[in-house]
Curated annotation (Swiss-Prot):
Motif (YSIRK-G/S signaling motif): 23-34
Listed GO CC annotations: extracellular region
The organism's taxonomic lineage, starting at the top: Bacteria, Bacillati, Bacillota, Bacilli, Bacillales
GO BP terms, alphabetized: cell adhesion
Source organism: Staphylococcus aureus (strain Newman)
Protein's UniProt name: Serine-aspartate repeat-containing protein D
Length: 1315
């Protein structure tokens, strides 16, 4: 099993130790060295032959029997699949054309490589072990080809010319002879009839039993790792180091990491393909027992396959010649690390070289889906080797709505162990396409007819099935590395729906499914001691209405290897190194120097006995030297190097021996002849200073600038070093070789470079921003650079309100405060932001020379004025965005003007001729009408008059609410207001409100129509019969003066009656008037209001109201006064006392019913006919008793008593019907019938005593001269006494009075008095 959290391999209790395992199992096409890979099985593509991973092997068509020969009883009911045909899914390039129930007549069909999906790399491998095998460091690998191994070893062997006496140690024991076994994997051909379900429901009812659908599954051979018989010298045993240390820096490696396309289908799949890791490792002789080096691999790599125990196959490195362990392996899978610890082998042998040839895996856990340019890397020691690959997982097997995929995810096999044969796990994706399936069933079967040695099994005693439901939309790992914590365990829901068959099969009934499921089958291997066991397990998904689809997996077995070898010698050697600190002692980090010649002389004979040239790492070896004293001389040192001090320290293996020294070989190698050399180094630099006077020369009072970055480059422009100046402005580059260098100074912030190479003293001038410095056997401290503080300038000016919108600042125009102004550099980056002050001024300070961008934010309620008006840039507007240039002085010319946008308000005053309150097309404007504009507080703002077309307009108005008042033009009357629903056509009346909101308001109209004029007048006539009525025979009176007064009593007109007595006042408006008739001389006012309004007399003063029509009813009549001549002489003394008592009771009952119907249509002309019939009956009874005694002499006394009772009952019924039709002319007929009955009884008793001498007088009241006319032109007399019906009562009363006093009345005298 595999712990996915820390990638630590976990083995089950009781697992056989790997050292007893003869075989190990690898995943198909993962390509691990010395493995046979596992494959995913699906149906083939016809008669095409699949290609092996490395080469095509002879196919063993071992399974040619028909499906019927291998069928066993299966109880699963899948009858619904019988009639279905399977077709190829064009989208599945890795799929096959023959699936499910389909049978063809093509005979045996081979499954192409594209049809085989291998298991995934879940960081576990499979090992097989025979329990009777003994542990042996020289493991027998029957899959290895010795000839190929040896040739590869030689290919990897370095050309060590000094080892001419090396003897190759060849394996001689029987175990090593077994290495000659072929490494080729046997190609297994699997017939599809064996893959077919033995359940009859999976066989097409229409198929011919002779037409077998056979598909061959081919397992390609795998390339085994090549053992390296690495040549080594045998050294004398050295004391082991007391403390183990990491010696990654003391090993060198030549490594290749190759992605192997095992099935050569141009697709890299972690489960099918693998990585080939080959490396030749050279161990420095300084390495001691207990020291270690590491191999680090990336997260995308794992070092074992399906079996956690198989990690030991990448294990200790051994000498293949004698089986001796060179380095032991320790795995840290959590950190992707292998630590190799050296044994004392390295103490006893020199020039140890090791070769590894591993097949390692791609980790599907970190590569869950197909992805391009996936990096894989392995670091051996300190050297990292990388490669990349485009990962392309095969698609799921799909047929119609059915889809499936599977892989072996863990396999541990113990071949030959009956008690613990091992286990394996297969992961199956059911319905990964998340289609809705009906009656879905999954059949899992550990059987294939082409694999007779299949050690898989499925039954309820050894098999454990887990079922997980996948959330909708969840992305499954295409490498089948499943994190079950993210899924839902539904195993318990399906326990009763799992049916085990007798043919190593199980069927899971999912019923109706619309989501994906993950099925994990965990089962045990069958016991086997076969030399070539295989594992095959199939999975088939069926559902109603869809063709079934199948997939499967297969595995084979083999091993990994590594190794090395050596030979005992005596030699002199060690190391030439660059002693960078010149202390004469080798230290960590100091590197070797190659191509130095080392010559060894026999010190006794001065004979040259050996010569070598140091390798690139500085090491050298002079072999085959017997015991004795030798002189070692070093020559041909690299140019420019000098020798470090010799014999420093107390460790002769680490010190320097100098150019020539004598050493002794005594029974062991002498590796102490070292030489330390160093390359003299020089300095380059000087000074960065502030050139305050800008003369380009360092003056005594000018100080350095700290913190300036200085960069050193080689002649090719490669950066070598970077430093910053110190507090004094000094800088220095140290440890430089002779050569030409480039020095670059970074301009410090706020400074400007001074002039370059002023004067003649190169140590005092400025070399500028970039200069070249030469080192030639001495320091160069002359490279200086001067800077002066960059002058700062200001930019800005003014934002103003351009009230007249001319784009120029006028003296009366004021600044706008609070306007945001932004300064940007040439790249559009914001440098500063400010706001204008109360006077509209703004300024950006501290600016260097350059081009700037200034942006003005338009203030609320304003609009930018025109740009660039006039020729004076100091007062014009630069707009809302402009460019300002600073060149050695301030720039105070950047202005921007804005004005408040104003709008217009107004429209139209028109003559509404039809008085409908709506502007019609033919109605024209009224000119000269005064219109007043006020603000909300009634303050008058402007006054205009309408033009000749009736138009008016108020301009330059701000947003706001205004009041508009229209003055009624003379002779006009305002029309109706807001008629209709068109605000632009109706009348807003005399006073209205107008709102301006960011636009003109031209909707405020007012309509008027011409005020009608009327006439007033009629007639003054001579009332000859004094009855107060105009008779046809009575004529008018001319030259009677008539005066007209208005309501205020002011005289507005005077006229005289014409020769016919007619008069008229014209051009009058509706209103109240008073008409005064001046009585003609010698005439008397006749009675008033005696009859109809147009025939009677209205009196001397008449109040009248004109309402929308003429009034020609104002008449007045006069009659001529009577005259009398009498001569009388009378002497009379008369005393008259008169007492009159009068009691009068009057009861009057009056009932009046009046029904009137009137329909009237009137335009402008009216003709009226009126007929009136009136019948009046009046009965009056009056009884009067009068007693009168009169004594007349000269004195007359009269007493009169009168009692009068009057009862009056009056009933009046009046029916009036009036119909009037009028268009432009109106005719009106009015018929009125009136019946009036009046009964009156009057009783009057009067007693009168009168004493009269000669004179008797009586006064009677006169009818008033002034009457009031109402608007109906009906005259009404001013009230006298009583009510309107008092006329009849008074008649009765006066009748009684006249009867009682008849003798006393003198008619002639009364007329005189009336006059």
């Amino acid at each position: 099993m595999l712990n996915r959290e820390n990638k630590t391999a976990i083995t089950r209790k009781g697992m056989v130790s790997n050292r007893l395992n003869k075989f190990s199992i690898r995943k198909y096409t993962v390509g691990t060295a010395s493995i046979l890979v596992g494959t995913t099985l699906i149906f083939g593509l016809g008669n095409q032959e699949a290609k092996a991973a490395e080469s095509t092997n002879k196919e063993l068509n071992e399974a040619t029997t028909s499906a019927s020969d291998n069928q066993s009883s299966d109880k699963v009911d899948m009858q619904q699949l019988n009639q279905e045909d399977n077709t190829k899914n064009d989208n599945q390039k890795e799929m096959v054309s023959s699936q499910g129930n389909e049978t063809t007549s093509n005979g045996n069909k081979l499954i192409e490589k594209e049809s085989v999906q291998s298991t995934t790399g879940n960081k576990v491998e499979v090992s097989t072990a025979k329990s009777d095998e003994q542990a042996s460091p020289k493991s027998t690998n029957e899959d290895l080809n010795t000839k190929q191994t040896i040739s590869n070893q030689e290919a990897l062997q370095p050309d060590l010319q000094e080892n001419k006496s090396v003897v190759n140690v060849q394996p001689t024991n029987e175990e090593n002879k077994k290495v000659d076994a072929k490494t080729e994997s046997t190609t297994l051909n699997v017939k599809s009839d064996a893959i077919k379900s033995n359940d009859e429901t999976l066989v097409d009812n229409n198929s011919n039993s002779n037409n077998e659908n056979n598909a061959d599954i081919i397992l390609p051979k795998s390339t085994a790792p090549k053992r390296l018989n690495t040549r080594m010298r045998i050294a004398a045993v050295q004391p082991s180091s007391t403390e183990a240390k990491n010696v990654n820096d003391l090993i060198t490696s030549n490594t290749t990491l190759t992605v192997v396309d095992a099935d050569k289908n141009n697709k890299i799949v972690p489960a099918q393909d693998y990585l080939s890791l080959k490396s030749q490792i050279t161990v420095d002789d300084k390495v001691k027992s207990g020291d270690y080096f590491t191999i680090k691999y990336s997260d995308t790599v794992q070092v074992y396959g399906l079996n956690p125990e198989d990690i030991k196959n990448i294990g200790d490195i051994k000498d293949p010649n004698n089986g001796e362990t060179i380095a032991t392996a320790k795995h840290d899978t959590a950190n992707n690390l292998i630590t190799y610890t050296f044994t004392d082998y390295v103490d006893r042998f020199n020039s140890v070289q090791m070769g590894i040839n591993y097949s390692i895996y791609m980790d599907a856990d970190t590569i869950p889906v197909s992805k391009n340019d996936v990096e894989f890397n392995v670091t051996i020691g300190n050297t990292t080797t990388k490669t990349t690959a485009n990962i392309q997982y095969p698609d799921y097997v799909v047929n119609e709505k059915n889809s499936i995929g599977s892989a072996f995810t863990e396999t541990v096999s113990h071949v030959g162990n009956k008690e613990n044969p091992g286990y394996y796990k297969q992961t199956i994706y059911v319905n990964p396409s998340e289609n809705s399936l009906t009656n879905a069933k999954l059949k899992v079967q550990a059987y294939h007819s082409s694999y007779p040695n299949n050690i898989g099994q499925i039954n309820k005693d050894v098999t454990d099935i887990k079922i997980y439901q996948v959330p909708k939309g969840y992305t499954l790992n295409k490498g089948y590395d499943v994190n079950t914590k993210e899924l839902t365990d539904v195993t318990n829901q399906y326990l009763q729906k799992i049916t085990y068959g007798d043919n190593n099969s199980a069927v899971i009934d999912f019923g109706n499914a619309d989501s994906a499921y993950v099925v994990m089958v965990n089962t045990k291997f069958q016991y086997t001691n076969s030399e070539s066991p295989t594992l095959v397990q199939m999975a088939t998904l069926s559902s109603t209405g869809n063709k079934s689809v199948s997939t499967g997996n297969a595995l084979g077995f083999t091993n990994n290897q590594s190794g090395g070898a050596g030979q005992e010698v005596y030699k002199i050697g060690n190391y030439v190194w660059e002693d960078t600190n010149k202390n004469g002692v080798q230290e960590l980090g100091e590197k070797g120097v190659g191509n130095v010649t080392v010559t060894v002389f026999d010190n006794n004979t001065n004979t040259k006995v050996g010569e070598a040239v140091t390798k690139e790492d500085g090491s050298y070896l002079i072999p085959n030297l017997p015991n004795g004293d030798y002189r070692v001389e070093f020559s041909n040192l690299p140019k420019g190097y000098e020798v470090t001090p010799s014999k420093q320290g107390n460790n002769e293996e680490l010190d320097s021996n100098g150019l020539s020294s004598v050493i002794t070989v005594n029974g062991k190698d002498n590796l102490s002849a070292d030489l330390g050399i160093y390359k003299p180094k020089y300095n380059l630099g000087d000074y960065v200073w502030e050139d305050t006077n800008k003369n380009g020369i360092q003056d005594q009072d000018e100080k350095g600038i700290s913190g300036v970055t200085v960069t050193l480059k080689d002649e090719n422009g490669n950066v070598l070093k970077t430093v910053t100046t110190d507090a004094d402005g000094k800088y220095k580059f140290t440890d430089l070789d002779n050569g030409n260098y480039k020095v670059e100074f970074t301009t410090p912030e706020g400074y400007t470079p001074t002039t370059v190479t002023s004067g003649s003293d190169i140590e005092k001038d400025s070399n500028g921003l970039t200069t070249t410095g030469v080192i030639n056997g001495a320091d160069n401290m002359t490279l200086d650079s001067g800077f002066y503080k960059t002058p700062k300038y200001n930019l800005g000016n003014y934002v103003w309100e351009d009230t007249n919108k001319d784009g120029k600042q006028d003296s009366t125009e004021k600044g706008i405060s609070g306007v945001t102004v932004t300064l940007k550099n040439e790249n559009g980056e914001v440098l500063q932001t400010t706001k204008t002050d109360k006077d509209g001024k703004y300024q950006f300070t501290g600016l260097e020379n350059g081009t700037y961008k200034v942006e003005f934010e338009t203030p609320s309620g304003y609009t930018p004025t025109q740009v660039g008006s006039g020729t004076d840039e100091g007062i014009d507007s630069n707009g809302t965005s402009t460019t300002g240039v600073i060149k050695d002085k301030d720039n105070d010319t950047i202005d921007s003007g804005f004005y408040k946008p104003t709008y217009n308000l107004g429209d139209y005053v028109w003559e509404d001729t039809n008085k409908n309150g709506v502007q019609d097309k033919d109605e024209k404007g009224i000119s000269g009408v005064t219109v007043t504009l006020k603000d909300e507080n009634d303050k008058v703002l402007k006054t205009v008059t309408t033009d000749e077309n009736g138009k008016y307009q108020f301009t330059d108005l701000n947003n706001g609410t205004y009041k508009v008042e229209f003055e009624t033009p003379s002779g006009y009357t305002p029309t109706s207001v807001t008629s209709g629903n068109d605000t632009e056509k109706d009348s807003n009346g005399l006073t209205t409100t107008g709102v301006i909101k960011d636009a003109d308001n031209m909707t405020l109209d007012s309509g008027f129509y011409k005020t009608p004029k009327y006439s007033l007048g009629d007639y003054v006539w001579y009332d000859s019969n004094k009855d107060g009525k105009q008779d046809s025979t009575e004529k008018g009176i001319k030259d009677v003066k008539v005066t007209l007064l208005n309501e205020k009593g002011e005289v507005i007109g005077t006229t005289k009656t014409d020769e016919n007595g007619k008069y008229c006042f014209d051009n009058l408006d509706s209103g109240k008037y008073k008409v005064i008739f001046e009585k003609p001389a010698g005439l008397t006012q006749t009675g008033t209001n005696t009859t109809e309004d147009d025939k009677d007399a209205d009196g001397g003063e008449v109040d009248v109201t004109i309402t929308d029509h003429d009034d020609f009813t104002l008449d007045n009549g006069y009659y001529e006064e009577e005259t009398s001549d009498s001569d009388s002489d009378s002497d009379s003394d008369s005393d008259s006392d008169r007492d009159s008592d009068s009691d009068s009771d009057s009861d009057s009952d009056s009932d009046s019913d009046s029904d009137s119907d009137s329909d009237s249509d009137s335009d402008s002309d009216s003709d009226r006919d009126s007929d009136s019939d009136s019948d009046s009956d009046s009965d009056s009874d009056s009884d009067s008793d009068s007693d009168s005694d009169s004594d007349s002499d000269s004195d007359s006394d009269s007493d009169s008593d009168s009692d009068s009772d009057s009862d009056s009952d009056s009933d009046s019924d009046s029916d009036s019907d009036s119909d009037s039709d009028s268009d432009s002319d109106s005719d009106s007929d009015s018929d009125s019938d009136s019946d009036s009955d009046s009964d009156s009884d009057s009783d009057s008793d009067s007693d009168s005593d009168s004493d009269s001498d000669s004179d008797a007088g009586k006064h009677t009241p006169v009818k008033p001269m002034s009457t009031t006319k109402d608007h109906h032109n009906k005259a009404k007399a001013l009230p006298e006494t009583g009510n309107e019906n008092s006329g009849s009562n008074n008649a009765t009363l006066f009748g009684g009075l006249f009867a009682a006093l008849g003798s006393l009345l003198l008619f002639g005298r009364r007329k005189k008095q009336n006059k």
